[in-house]
Amino acid sequence: MALHVPKAPGFAQMLKEGAKHFSGLEEAVYRNIQACKELAQTTRTAYGPNGMNKMVINHLEKLFVTNDAATILRELEVQHPAAKMIVMASHMQEQEVGDGTNFVLVFAGALLELAEELLRIGLSVSEVIEGYEIACRKAHEILPNLVCCSAKNLRDIDEVSSLLRTSIMSKQYGNEVFLAKLIAQACVSIFPDSGHFNVDNIRVCKILGSGISSSSVLHGMVFKKETEGDVTSVKDAKIAVYSCPFDGMITETKGTVLIKTAEELMNFSKGEENLMDAQVKAIADTGANVVVTGGKVADMALHYANKYNIMLVRLNSKWDLRRLCKTVGATALPRLTPPVLEEMGHCDSVYLSEVGDTQVVVFKHEKEDGAISTIVLRGSTDNLMDDIERAVDDGVNTFKVLTRDKRLVPGGGATEIELAKQITSYGETCPGLEQYAIKKFAEAFEAIPRALAENSGVKANEVISKLYAVHQEGNKNVGLDIEAEVPAVKDMLEAGILDTYLGKYWAIKLATNAAVTVLRVDQIIMAKPAGGPKPPSGKKDWDDDQND
């Protein structure tokens, strides 16, 4: 009989062999804080217009060169459970606002770093948490008073482009004026009267070659495809969309046919040809002059399409088919039947064009109220275009936020310093031990202008003391001047560097929640990982169409 080895007494004897558990301040809380600090330190250097790029190679060996925190975190696949909570908070920020993910990380990291100092002094975790929650509520009370202006007219391209400039600046510093104008044109052209703006209605088509300044906006959709038949341009297009292959419906029968004469050979496939001819003619008779199909196109069907002057476009992606249906107002038909008038889509012109050396099919809507707008991006490398696409995404999301709430607060660290100043003076009035946590919460706001200053290569302490001095005089809108070679400050409202109110509101809320959640953990219990080989960690979604 095998010798029985007794387990160590205590918590471990209840768990299966191989399980790990950590408890108490030293093992659990400080370790978690350390992991979150490391994560915040990674993305902190990418904060702001002068932030550095990160080169990330993911598990599929795809290369990303970007300073967009959301992309960096998504591709890093963070394993540490506490750091994962902060990553989740930044994902929530991306879903809620679409921008400000790095703010959440930097701020949450600063909160936890300062919480560690308080815990080492001897405060209890519950006192730190209570202080942080009081300070967060206070920050949300102060924030509406810091609003410096509101968007007046979201249908004015010049005004919208000036408001989008700040969010694009942090991703594409130097190209922000041109890109903001492009995005403003695209957003304003499809902004419905109801005021419900859908970010999916702005499409991006990336075409290699030329430079960023050759990018343009089109009302309608652009596909990197070629037409199948001879017809390459149609004006006043009536469009029939099919989700099935453009082919005859013939049952596959196995059998041997004995053909004795040439006439029999001629007649053998005539019935099939006549049927195909009748089908294509029926479609042409409805007035449809463009057919878009989601499957393969048979040679015979192509021949008859050319005969009846029908333009044929093949889209492999079901997502593209859906978006096209939405753009032109068509219904995708599952069988090759002639469409009725309601099922056909309309647009002003469909034509084959060449951008650089890439063939594209353009479905153009001249009307200003087209359902979908496409930004055609040009760039010298794929990585550059991917990064510009992320900047466009941020710009479009900022426009969406402005349609929900038009209020704006000053950027460049001005809002953060004002919040820090007011929350510190509020902390002085609190009698309990929470006042230390409230003051540290205020100090955490300094991490934002500090990161901006460090990334711009100026002395952070000097900048922050200058900002405090100016804010003490009552200039709420003064922030860091990142373009100056020396530590300098300027009025953000005059410079046009503005952040959305909602973006700041949610970022403070989510960062505080994440930090408090991490602090609340006092035990980590990890079961032994299941044995056996790990499944291949390839792409989660086998249907790759949505990325086309």
From Swiss-Prot:
EC number assigned by the record: 3.6.1.-
Keyword Membrane: no
One Gene Ontology cellular component annotation held by this UniProt entry: cytosol
UniProt-annotated binding residues for Mg(2+): D99
Disordered, as annotated region: 529-548
Location in chain, cross-link Glycyl lysine isopeptide (Lys-Gly) (interchain with G-Cter in SUMO2): K224, K254, K260, K534, K539
Pfam families per UniProt: Cpn60_TCP1 (PF00118)
Positions of post-translational Phosphoserine modification: S23, S162, S213, S269, S317, S537
Assigned protein family: Belongs to the TCP-1 chaperonin family.
Protein name: T-complex protein 1 subunit theta
Gene: CCT8
